[in-house]
Each structure stands twice: as C-alpha cells, then as structure tokens.
C-alpha cells in the first residue's frame, strides 16, 4: 500500500516539475524577447516607437458649431510619418504597455475640447495631455519616449494656435455678415412701411369723401320723398271715402234677379224629368220576369229526384267513350328509333360544344371571373384579420371564450364568436403556408382592450343624480367626499342653495329642520387613474350630514344624528360598448367572407364537364320520348278517378235545394218591393207654388251710389300716381343708402387691413430688434477678455500661445535603466506554483499520517470541530508566512516606492493565503479532480498570457482567475486603479477558504482517478 502511494506521489511530482519547466521556458522566451526588444529600441529610429492614443474627449459647442479637437488631434497624427500611432481603448493600451506592444500611451482627457475653446475666458485653465511610458525600459529608451511625447505635444500646440486664429477670423467674418443682414432688414422694414402703411393711409381720406357725398345725396332724396308724401296726404279729402249705405248698387240687383230666374228654371226642369221618367219605366215587365223565374225554380226543385239517374248514366257513357279512344292510341317511337336518335343527338351536341366559339369565350370569362373573385376574397379576409396602423378598426383580436364572457356576452354568443376566431386562425395558417415569411399575418394580441375600454367614461363621464329629503333637529354640517379617480362637475342644492361637488365641509342653516338635497352633475374618469379604477369599476360619492364641534358628554344619552347619503355606481357595463361592437362586427364580417371563400375554394380550376352536360340533355329528350306509355296509363287512371267521383259531383249539383229555397225567398221580396214602387209612380206629384211677384221689389231699388263710386275711383287713381312717384324716390333713397353702407364697409375693411399690416410690421421690427440685440450681445463677447483693463490679458495670451501641457502618469515601479525588473506575470505564476507545492505537502501528510488532531476527541464532542479550526489556521498561517517572505523579496525586486510598500505586502500576503487555502481544500476534498482543476487554472493562465495582444484581450483572459490577480498587481504598480475593492474581495476569499478547510468530508474508499 505504501509503495502504491509513493507511485502516485511520484507521478504528481513529475507533473509539477514538467509544468514548472514549461513555465520557465515560456516566460524566458516571451520576456527575454521583450528584453531584447527593449535593448534594441535604443538604437532604432523614432518610427520603431509604437504610441497608443486613447481618445476620451467629449464634443463641445463653440459659436453654435460642434467642436471635436480629440478627433482633429488624431487626424493630424494620422499623417505623421516619424512615429507609429494607433487609436485604441484604454484597456488595450494598458495591455500593450504590459506586453511590450506599445512604448507610450497618450490619453486625451474627457474635457479636452471644452478647455481648449476658452477664448472668451478671463483666466483660462490649462489643458493636460496625459501620457504613460512602458514599465522596465532602459534609461535611454525612456528619454527617447519622453522626447517623442514632447515633439507630438509641440506639433499639436502649433495646430491649436492656428485653430484659434481661424476662429477669431471667422468671428470677424460673421460680424461683417451680420452688419450686412441688419442693413438688409432695415431696408425691408422701410419698404414695407411705405407699401403696407404709408400709401394706404394717404388713400384713406378719399374713402371719407365718397362716404360724405353719398350721405348728402341720400339726405336730399329722403327730404324730397317726405315732402311729396306729405303733399299727397294733405291734398286728399276725407269726405271722398264716405259711402251712403242706404242704397244698393244696381249690379247687385241685377245679379240677384238672374240667380232667382236660374233657380226657378231648375225647379221646372226637375219636375218635367220626374214625369218623363215615371212614364218610361216598365215595372210590369220586370215583375213578370221575376215571377216566371220563381216558377222555374219550383219546377227544378220538383225534378231533382227524377233527373239524378239520367245524369249518372250520361256521365258514365261519356267517360267510357273517352277511355276507348285513349286505349286505342299507340306510341309513335320504336326502341330502335330511340337509340338512333340518342346517338345522332349526342354527336350533334358534342360537335356544337367543341366548335362553338361563343360557348368557349363564355367558359373562359367564367373562369377569369372565378379567379378574380377568389383573389378579392383573399384580400378581404386579409384586411378582416390584420390591423392596419392608426386608423383601422376592422381587425380581429386573439380572444378566447372566457374573454368574450368577460366582455359581457352570454355563453351561447361566446361559443359562436370563439368558433369564428378559430376559423380565422385556421385561415391564417393556410395563408402563411402559401406566402413568404415577410408577408405572414397574425391575429392582434388581446390585452383586455374590449373589456376595459374607458374612453366613454373619460370623454363623456357618468351622470350623478340624487334627490333626498332629510329631517333632523341637530344637523348643522355637510361633509362631501368625492372619488379620487374622477373629476366632478355640477352642484349640490340644499334648500335651493348651490354648492360645488368637491371635497369640502359646509356649514348648514340650523334654523331649518328639513333639508331638501338635490345632486346633479357629471363624473369624468381621470386618465391617470384608469388602472386603479379598473380594480373595482365603481364610482363613489359620499354626502355625510352631521353635527360640527359637538363634544359628547359621558351622561348624554341623546344620540348624535348622522345621515350618510352615498352614491355608488358600478360602471362595468360602460366599459365595452364601442370596442365590443367593433370586434363583433369584424368577426361577423370575417365569418361571411370565410363562408364564401370555403364555398368557392377549389372550384376555380375545375374543368367544365362537357360529357356530363351532353348526357344530361340527351337523357332528358329520350325520357320524354319513352314516357308516352307512362303518360297514357296516367290519363286512364285519371278517367277511372273521375268515374269514381262522378256520383259525388252529381250529388253536389243536385243537392243544393237549400240554396234554391233561399233564392226563391229573395225573388219574392224583390217582387213585393217592385209592386210598391209601381203604386208610387201611379200617383201624380204636387207642384210647389212660387211667388214671382216679389221679384219686382228688387227692380224698384235705387242706384244713386254709382256717381259717388265713380268719384272715388278718380281720387284713387290720383293717389296711385302719387304713390308711384313716392316709390321711385324711395328706390333712389334705398340705392343711396346701399352705396353709403358699402362705403362704410369698405372703410371698415380698409381700417382692419391697416391694423393687421401695422401689427405685422410691428412684429417684424420687434424681431429685427431682437436679432440685432442678440448680435450685439454675441459680438460684445468676442474677445471681451482679451484685455485686463488697459493691458493685455497675460493669462489668455499664455494660454493661446501654449494651451496644452503634458502630464506624466507616475508609475509605482521605479524606472531604473540599469536594473532588470521582474514582470507581474512571472511573479503571480511563481506564487501560484508555490501554493500548489504547499497544498500538496498538506495533502500528502494527511494521506500518510491521517487528519491532524491536536486535541483528543474523547474529552468533548466539540473537539473535532476545534481540530478542524486549528488545521485551517495552520494552513492559513503557512500561506501568510509564505506571502510575507515572497512580498519582501518582490518588493526589493520591483523597487516599490516607500509610500506603496505596506499595501503591496498586504496584497501579496492575501493573495498567497487565498492560493494556499483554496488549493489545499481542492486536494484534500476532491483529490485528483482538485489537482486537475489547479492545473486547468494554470493552463488557462498560460493561454491568456499568449493571447494578450495590442488589439484586445481574448476570452480566456476574462475567464482565467490568475489573469485578474495579474491585472491587479499590474494596475497597482502603474498607479492606475485603486485597490480597495480588490483587497476586500481577497479578504472574503481568505475567509471562504478558511471555512472550507474546516469542513472536509472524508470518504471510506479513497483512490486517485
């Protein structure tokens, strides 16, 4: 067993030795070449010095223009042939300094452009161009790089001075352009003042002159009109219009006589007509005819029983004769004739269908129409499903049955519309299979747009109405509490007095014992409260009537009167009207189109079946030819049926005795009525007596009024003439007034136009003044700090002559050209290998001797835990001692400056403790797997070191734990980044490693994999 363990130990030792030798060879090759490069760079030319440019400059604005001096600096260096420049990020530049890819890193700071454009500042701040040289170079190489940086800085200062001079000249040119623009604006204002305002004002008095002339003319015409009218009225005689009512006009008398004669003549004519009609009517003939008809009916009634058998016999004979004639008929078509006709008819129809151009054109037209109809249906179905941007309301949401029920539909309607949605999905899948990916369609996602549409509540609101009558003796205050989700408009009336609907307390009149409360208003949902409102979908308004400032006494048994009038409106029904209606309409429209689509699908390409059509037509003709026999049999059946029903028909004809009796009674009544009329005609009518003598009284009436009516007519004619003259004058006055009104309107319009033009001119002048003031203000700022009193501003002069200064980012590592330094990469590698050896020593001891027990477990059950703590402490202390020794040696090798040594030693100690604790835990717990993980971490570090190029860092550098330790020491030695966070992380890792070593689980069977 011991021999086997020694074999395992020998294998592990050989692996470690091979790793160390490989590492030394790799480092010697890599960093030896770098050392040779450093020694050769002393004798090389300047173009062998690689300079990394890090541009962190942010653009700024100067005189309204964007300025990026960092980019200008880089473009300037791009044309430089003496040095080799590359623009990279800060991380790439630092990595290049680390592995020898770059000798100098120049950093353009973030505020470079802003500080460079301080031409208007009185005491401008200096600009610092930061740079850093590679660590560990020879003294001569370091001096050469310093010289390169100085040359680059001097060149850029010259370029920057040229930029300043160009900026000053541009400002002067802008000032010259602005002065010209000011003169142009002033000329434009003067021209507009002359055309817009001055000339119209000069023409303005002419409008007043025209108005005055029209007014004078209208006044004259009005005066003339009134004079003429007054003259006409004064010349009229009032007696002229008086009529003597004691007399009637002769024309009235004549008309009355004529009317009387007409009535008398009409009466005579009516009497003559009556007499003539009485003589012409032959009532006897009518009466005799009716009596004869009555006797015939009696005769027919008596013959009913004797004629029935004769009717039956006659009908039977006729039917038998018809049956014999039909049975004797034979079919004119034989079977062979029918078959020949079938063949000929088929050939004829086939030839007609094949050669008929009109039929072919009709079939092609039908086919094209079907294709166009199918295409239109597909487009309509696409529009029904897809939602177009902004304006489309006819689209389909991807809703389920539960969504429809939540929107207010019953279960039957929800099932109906859910089936339509499934049809839409089915059609969508068929459509997408036929179309490319870019033309695929989808149903619009549903997010309660139908069930939670609050647009009507936001725009229209909900009415709030309530009427209550409250009776109480001690109520003196009203408290109103509104729903915070709504804006209320309206009022609350209490006994006729109005109060706004808002959160408030109102003192009531205590003299009233009865309060009539009326609430009338509108509550509109707030847009920002929509989400909270949808939780309960209820609007609340509370009116609380009570007592103010009442202190309840302990012995006061009288209860305080409180009346709560609360309005709660559940608005769930107001949320889905418009949106739900639109969605159901869209679904119904799609359903109709989809049914048409399924009916026509597959028929557009189906060929026309000519053979089937021909067979159908021929079969129809042949069936008609062969149906002769069947038709003959059918006619015979009808004759048999008529014979069977003949008895019933005869009985119906002969058994109408009841109707005959009724007719006989009606005829008897008619005969009696005609007998009475005959008696009336036999009597002579009595003629009325008319007293024609009274008509003479009308003839004696006087017509003396005719003369006075003639005189009235003459006066009325004269009055009409005067009225026509007045009308002519009035028309003239109206025309003058209309002209006057037009002049006034024109005057008003001209005044308004002048006002508008004056306002436009005023605005333009104000804008010009503002532009001129802005120019004067900006021009005043140009080089306003160029002088300090009467002397030149020395600070500004010094800044403009040498604006950019260089700033060296100090390195922690002493730059001694005569001393070789060790790289942080090799330093980290040595620490890790030392920790692996230490971890393997602890692991080997534990395998050989067992777990270290400093305290016997028999004394206490907690002694095992104390032994684990002591073991972890021993491992950690070992790492601490090794870290202290390695740190002191490395401090001298790196020549760390005095102020940085303590932190450097602390970093080395913590790093060494982390390496020792973690590696020891891996070997103690997972053994060979732990060894594999340790070697894997080492291998990742080798790969990461090999992939460190100036262009960037590889993925392995990001996942390698040792690379982070390497970067930590490199950044600290170059004074780049603070190490506070790194020390905290290392401390946490030390604690974790210490705790892990306390809880080692030993398995019964141990072996190397």
Curated annotation (Swiss-Prot):
Output the Gene3D superfamilies linked to this UniProt entry: abc type-2 transporter like domain
What highest taxon heads this organism's lineage?
Bacteria
Annotated membrane topology: Multi-pass membrane protein
Annotated transmembrane regions: 7-27, 822-842, 869-889, 903-923, 928-948, 979-999
* UniProt keywords, alphabetically: Cell membrane, Membrane, Transmembrane, Transmembrane helix, Virulence
Principal cellular location given in the protein's record: membrane
Where does the protein end up? Cell membrane
GO cellular component terms, semicolon-separated = plasma membrane
Q: What does this protein do?
A: Component of the type VII secretion system (Ess). Provides together with EssB and other components such as EssC and EssE a secretion platform across the cytoplasmic membrane in the host.
Q: How does it assemble?
A: Homodimer. Interacts with EssB.
The record's listing under PANTHER family reads:
TRANSPORT PERMEASE PROTEIN, TRANSPORT PERMEASE YVFS-RELATED
Q: Which family does it belong to?
A: Belongs to the EsaA family.
What name does this protein carry? Type VII secretion system accessory factor EsaA
* Annotated organism of origin: Staphylococcus aureus (strain Mu50 / ATCC 700699)
- Name of the gene encoding the protein in the UniProt record: esaA
